[in-house]
């Protein structure tokens, strides 16, 4: 759904004012009713989501039945937060809102009826509604319309396993490996020491037993006298 302003010979500023007034009336009393005969409009997805710090795209397209003027002066603008919200981008100036400085890219050229608005370094404060506005000159005068529903952007939380630093994961596995190696190494050394001690004890016992047996035999030997 889109709201159209048609002003033969009028200025874009006047078109902007009438657009706001007409939209206010539409929202106040007739927002639920649609005109099946409309052959113009702006298409935007109902909602898009992205990861914090990444980029997010809002695709758009528009259509109209009129014949373009020799110099159509076609331009694209974007608002945010609500239908009457502040402009964040205007291709005809060009203009970029302070909040989005260095973070907006409009992939669209004159004559095209579709494009993509890309927001870089997506932030939590970017979560709101975005509305595409189209302005052009036709043989019937100025035509100026804007998407009514807009597109809602939301932040998607990434899974913890993907958000954790590889260095931290590697460190944990390395630490666990060292502890595991240490736990395996110390018992081995202790077992080896115990085995040596037991072996020495057995040798001492054997020597004592054999020595005692030799002593007894020597004691029991008949006296040669």
Swiss-Prot record:
Keyword Metal-binding annotated: no
Main subcellular location of this protein, as a coarse class: membrane
Keyword Nuclease applies: no
Extracellular side: 32-195
Subcellular location: Membrane
Stretches that traverse the bilayer: 196-216
Carbohydrate attachment residues: 90, 107, 160
Any single Gene Ontology cellular-component annotation: membrane
Protein's name according to its UniProt entry: Paired immunoglobulin-like type 2 receptor beta-2
Gene: Pilrb2
UniProt source species: Mus musculus
Keyword terms of this UniProt record: Glycoprotein, Membrane, Signal, Transmembrane, Transmembrane helix
Cytoplasmic face residues: 217-225
InterPro entries according to UniProt: Ig-like_dom_sf, Ig-like_fold, Immunoregulatory_rcpt-like
Function: Paired receptors consist of highly related activating and inhibitory receptors and are widely involved in the regulation of the immune system. PILRB2 is probably a cellular signaling activating receptor that associates with ITAM-bearing adapter molecules on the cell surface.
First and last residue of the signal peptide: 1-31
SUPFAM superfamilies attached to this UniProt entry: Immunoglobulin
PANTHER family associated with the record: PAIRED IMMUNOGLOBULIN-LIKE TYPE 2 RECEPTOR, PAIRED IMMUNOGLOBULIN-LIKE TYPE 2 RECEPTOR BETA-RELATED
UniProt membrane topology term: Single-pass type I membrane protein
């Amino acid at each position: 759904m889109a709201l159209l302003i048609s002003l033969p010979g009028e200025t874009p500023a006047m078109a902007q004012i009438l657009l706001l007034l007409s939209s206010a009336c539409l929202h106040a009393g007739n927002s639920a009713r649609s005109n099946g005969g409309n052959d113009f409009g702006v298409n935007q997805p109902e909602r898009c989501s992205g990861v914090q710090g990444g980029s997010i795209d809002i695709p758009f397209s528009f259509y109209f039945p009129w014949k373009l003027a020799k110099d159509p002066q076609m331009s694209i603008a974007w608002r945010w937060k609500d239908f009457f919200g502040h402009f964040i981008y205007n291709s005809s100036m060009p203009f970029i809102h302070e909040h989005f400085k260095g973070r907006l890219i409009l992939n669209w050229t004159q004559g095209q009826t579709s494009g993509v608005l890309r927001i870089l370094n997506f932030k939590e404060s970017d979560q709101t509604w975005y509305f595409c506005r189209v302005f052009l000159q036709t043989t019937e005068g100025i035509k100026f319309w804007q998407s009514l529903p807009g597109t809602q952007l939301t932040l998607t939380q990434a899974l913890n396993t993907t958000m954790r630093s590889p260095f931290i994961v590697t460190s944990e596995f390395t630490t666990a490996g060292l502890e595991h190696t240490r736990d395996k190494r110390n018992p081995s050394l202790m077992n080896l020491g115990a085995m040596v001690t037991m072996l020495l004890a057995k040798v001492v016992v054997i020597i004592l037993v054999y020595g005692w047996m030799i002593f007894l035999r020597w004691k029991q030997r008949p006296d040669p006298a």
